[in-house]
Design a protein with these regions (language model features):
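Extended, highly charged segments
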Residues: 1-56, 61-65, 97-98
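Phosphate/anion-contacting hairpin/loop surfaces
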Residues: 69-133
Length: 133
């Protein structure tokens, strides 16, 4: 499982590729992760600018203009910044394609990670509200 320093390193590594950019397309190839990815997530996220990328414990929070995506890497997950046309690997489950043409690709062999949506303050979400920073 990625530990806190790895999650913070991941946040810092992808931050400049997402903050200030618009989500051009969100592609979910495998919705059956730890919790099912919301069916309408692409509709909710597409076209929204990422305002901020935060970390709360081992969760990454993508603050958008109208709502937030909450991501956990799970036991074996990773996020990579790639050109969209990069060939897929076996466990590449989600692509967050940015207006820059770059893609944030979520790979999770064990599928213990998650990508969730909230329109409320994400810090009050049941998964986050009792966690320390």
């Amino acid at each position: 499982m990625p530990e806190l320093p790895e999650v913070e390193t991941t946040r810092r590594g992808i931050e400049s590729s997402v903050v200030g950019h618009v989500i051009h397309e969100l592609v979910v190839r495998e919705p059956r992760l730890r919790w099912r990815v919301p069916r309408n997530l692409a509709d909710l996220a597409d076209g929204q600018r990422v305002q901020q990328l935060r970390r709360r414990a081992k969760y990454l929070v993508f603050d958008l203009e109208r709502g937030s995506m909450i991501l956990h890497l799970g036991m074996s997950g990773s996020l990579r910044v790639l050109p969209r046309e990069t060939p897929l690997l076996v466990h590449d489950h989600i692509d967050i394609v940015m207006d820059s043409g770059m893609c944030i690709r979520f790979n999770d062999p064990r599928r213990f990670g998650c990508l969730l949506w909230t329109e409320e303050d994400p810090m009050t979400h049941p998964l986050l509200k009792s966690l320390a920073p």
